[in-house]
Design a protein with these regions (language model features):
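TRNA-recognition modules of translation machinery and tRNA-sensing kinases, especially anticodon-binding
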Residues: 1-131
Length: 131
């Protein structure tokens, strides 16, 4: 089999290089504003991310060896909120966090839409307002 599953595609060198160049520029800007990189797992416990909204719409759901319900992350914000609440709860605020990671989402068939996209973004947590 040589085709990718529908909604997924290979990214060839020219496009991959362009994407990398953009990501390096954005990362540099965010780093200059004090945003620190974080990474979260591709798989998350469904309950830890809440049962509604985008999590309910994720196209890939599975169970681990212990029977726990897992989802492939459809967004990066909720896993970061989970990480902050469980691992960085004593951190000094505001937290400036940045990420660059793939997510998998639902997409209508036969539209050419991608189900896997790379989200490059940031979260400002605990600030009194927009800075």
């Amino acid at each position: 089999m040589t085709a990718t599953p529908w909604g997924f595609r290979d990214i060839l060198p020219e496009e991959a290089q362009a994407r990398e160049d953009i990501a390096l520029t954005v990362r540099g800007i965010l780093k200059g504003h004090g945003y620190l990189p974080v990474e979260t797992p591709l798989l998350e416990h469904r309950d830890a991310l809440g049962g509604g909204g985008r999590i309910a719409d994720t196209p890939f759901k599975l169970f681990d060896d212990d029977g726990r319900f897992l989802v492939v992350r459809p967004d990066n914000t909720l896993p970061i909120v989970r990480m902050v609440a469980s691992r960085l709860d004593a951190a000094r605020l505001p937290l400036r966090l940045r990420y660059d990671a793939p997510v998998v989402r639902t997409a209508p068939r036969n539209t050419g839409a991608s189900r896997q996209v790379t989200q490059l973004g940031f979260e400002l947590i605990g600030a009194g307002g927009i800075e």
